[in-house]
Each structure stands twice: as structure tokens, then as C-alpha cells.
């Protein structure tokens, strides 16, 4: 099969372009995929080519329902080397907000799914560009939320600043979604505001504490439950020790 038969219906999607990349949709062997290639002014620069290869290496093994999957890295006629991802047919959060179509149900789904994706990214020690409404897609078929660009750098350990920046981005996106959808959930508004508090304040320390807040489980309540459980165990052990016959 010739390259032209392998790749058909290649179309540029300028609204999805990124800082260093152009994004295309195409058919590969008849199957719809998306292509991500360096902008023409960067294609001959070895540093940018290395950056692209590094992004592929980092993202290839990621597997999460709220992150667009990478399938391959190969040369496409007329475009050069491309990162090939699953086709994501849908609308960006930015466009949904701008068109006034964001619903309360979508906002509640966003609050949970976006946090799940961020937690997964952090578990894999990935440092990335800030997540923005432009890089979040609601798929057209089932309305699933997916992040289309999570960055390309992987560290042995994330710093507290990396985690804080992720949660700040999460808070900003959630607050904009709440305002756009008219969602009046006091809990979601409180979570968004705490994520955006000035550094050094009482921000959430990690995604797990944010998750607890979303589910209405306060840290203090968890500590009380743990202490009560430990006290009960000590009492039970003491009772059994007292009941033991003395030889």
C-alpha cells in the first residue's frame, strides 16, 4: 500500500493548534486519527525534534479514560514526523463555554474527571504545560471529558510547586465552568476558591484532599474517625487482656 493510500483526507485543524505544533485529522488505513506535527518553522530544529520525541516517549505508556491516547510516531507525507493519537471528535471546553452550552451536569462531570486525570498525571511524575479550557474536549458521542495535551516532561519526583500549579489550574477551570453553567453548588465553589488561594495560604496539599472535599469528607472528620477507631481497638485489646486468666 502506497503512502497516499495509507494516509487520506488529511485536514488541518487550526483551532486545535498548540504553541509548537499543528494538529490535523486524517484517515490511516481508513481509520480516523489525529496528527500532531511541529510547526514548519520548528521542523528542522534538532532541539524541537528532540522535544517531540520526548513527548511521545512520556505519553505513549499513559492509559487513562480522560486523557487522549497516543498510538504511534511516524512520518506522514507532506507533514514530516507526527505523533498519532486517537481521534477525538468533540468540542473544546472553551468553545462550549463561549457558546453558552455548558450545563450543570457537564460541570459536575468536569470537576470529577479533570481531577482524576490530574491525579493520574501526577502519579506518573509528569510536569506539563498548564491545563486550559482549550485543551479539554467533551466528546460528541458520550460527552466524555478528555485532555488532549498533557505536556512532555517526566521527573523522578514532582515538587510541591508542580502539584500546587496543577491544583491552581484546576481551580481556575472549575470556577470558570461554574460561572458559565450557573451551577450553584456551594461545595464546588468552595473547592475552586481554595485551589486558587494565594501561595502560602491554606490551599489543598494534593489531589486526594481535593477529592475528599468534592465528596464532602473533611480532613478533620477523617482524623476523628481514625482516632476513634484506634481508641476502640485499644479498649478491645485491654478488655481481652483483663479477661485472660492469671496462671
Regions found by a protein language model. Name each.
Residues 36-41:
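Conserved beta3-strand ATP-binding lysine motif
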Residues 42-61:
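AlphaC helix of the eukaryotic protein kinase fold
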Residues 72-74:
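A short, aromatic-enriched beta-strand patch in the conserved N-lobe beta-sheet
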Residues 77-92:
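Conserved short submotifs of the Hanks-type protein kinase catalytic core
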Residues 92-102:
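AlphaC helix of the protein kinase catalytic domain
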Residues 110-111:
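Activation segment signature within eukaryotic-like protein kinase domains
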Residues 116-126:
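Protein kinase catalytic-loop region centered on the HRD/HxD motif
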Residues 146-194:
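C-lobe/activation-segment region of protein kinase-like
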Amino acid at each position: 500500500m502506497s503512502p497516499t493510500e495509507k494516509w487520506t483526507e488529511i485536514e488541518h485543524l487550526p483551532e486545535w493548534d498548540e504553541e509548537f505544533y499543528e494538529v490535523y485529522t486524517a484517515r490511516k488505513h481508513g481509520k480516523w486519527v489525529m496528527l500532531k506535527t511541529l510547526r514548519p518553522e520548528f521542523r528542522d530544529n534538532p532541539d524541537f525534534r528532540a522535544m517531540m520525541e520526548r513527548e511521545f516517549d512520556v505519553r505513549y505508556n499513559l492509559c487513562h479514560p480522560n486523557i487522549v491516547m497516543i498510538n504511534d510516531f511516524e512520518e506522514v507525507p507532506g507533514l514530516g514526523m507526527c505523533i498519532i493519537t486517537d481521534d477525538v471528535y468533540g468540542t473544546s471546553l472553551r468553545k462550549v463555554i463561549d457558546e453558552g452550552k455548558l450545563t450543570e451536569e457537564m460541570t459536575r462531570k468536569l470537576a470529577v474527571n479533570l481531577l482524576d486525570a490530574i491525579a493520574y498525571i501526577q502519579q506518573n511524575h509528569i510536569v506539563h504545560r498548564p491545563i486550559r479550557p482549550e485543551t479539554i474536549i467533551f466528546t460528541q458521542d458520550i460527552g466524555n471529558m478528555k485532555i488532549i495535551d498533557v505536556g512532555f516532561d517526566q521527573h523522578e519526583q514532582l515538587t510541591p510547586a508542580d502539584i500546587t500549579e496543577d491544583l491552581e489550574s484546576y481551580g481556575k477551570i472549575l470556577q470558570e465552568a461554574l460561572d458559565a453553567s450557573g451551577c450553584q453548588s456551594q461545595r464546588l465553589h468552595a473547592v475552586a476558591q481554595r485551589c486558587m488561594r494565594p501561595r502560602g495560604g491554606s490551599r489543598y496539599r494534593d489531589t486526594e484532599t481535593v477529592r475528599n472535599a468534592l465528596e464532602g469528607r473533611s480532613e478533620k472528620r477523617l482524623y476523628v474517625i481514625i482516632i476513634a477507631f484506634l481508641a476502640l481497638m485499644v479498649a478491645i485489646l485491654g478488655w481481652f487482656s483483663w479477661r485472660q486468666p492469671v496462671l
